[in-house]
Amino acid sequence: MTALDSAIGRVLKQLDTSGLRDKTIVIWYSDNGAFMLKDRGLEVASNKPLRDGGVTLWEGGIRVPAIIRYPGHLKAGTVNQSPLISLDILPTLITLAGGPLPAERILDGQDMLPALAAQAAPEPRTFFFQYRNFSAVRRGKYKLVRIKPNQPFMLFDLEQDLSETTDLAERNPKVLNQLQQAYADWEREVAE
């Protein structure tokens, strides 16, 4: 963290020195949580209370912080808990740069500027994740996770169980079926 903090500090200082501070959008985020190496008998990092880590679709692998700086446009020190996905970066940057979102092409991400600027809460949405054998769907407080294609999905309530330890699939078949159907529809759409 010290090296990262120092490196980002140098970039920000150079932007200040060159007079580009107010014209530059700085985004820092990670694409995954810390690598755990449990499969090699090592636990070299901790994402607690989140489950597991990088290259998984458990919260420890996909719930990561993002820091965005754009003086004059985004209020410094604002903390926003709205979930974002890397696909949101392109439409958000287009909007921040004053450009129109393409009408002839569907973007998978959404413009998150209203949420980032604390102007409005983002519309409820469904997030889909696929990595190797892992599949996951998140809608609101619920998250569906499948470790392998031939295994059943597990259902978690992230508001009550951020560590993803209690599978609610049998107790909440309605939500399970809704999210499974959403995943099947998304999978079909992606394949087309």
Residues covered by each model-derived region:
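Residue-level signal for the nucleotide or nucleotide-sugar donor/cofactor binding architecture
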Residues: T2-A3, L84
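Metal-dependent active-site segment of extracytoplasmic phospho-/sulfohydrolases and closely related
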Residues: A3-L42
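Non-transmembrane alpha-helical segments in soluble domains
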Residues: D5, G9-L12, D16, L90-I94, ...
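C-terminal cap/loop subdomain of S1 sulfatases and analogous C-terminal strand-loop tails that border
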Residues: A34-L57, L74-T78, S82, L87-L158, ...
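Conserved hydrophobic/amphipathic secondary-structure segments
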Residues: W58-E59, Y70
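Short glycine- and hydrophobic/aromatic-rich loop-to-beta-strand nucleating segment
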Residues: A66-I68
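Intrinsically disordered, low-complexity polar regions and short flexible loop motifs
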Residues: D161
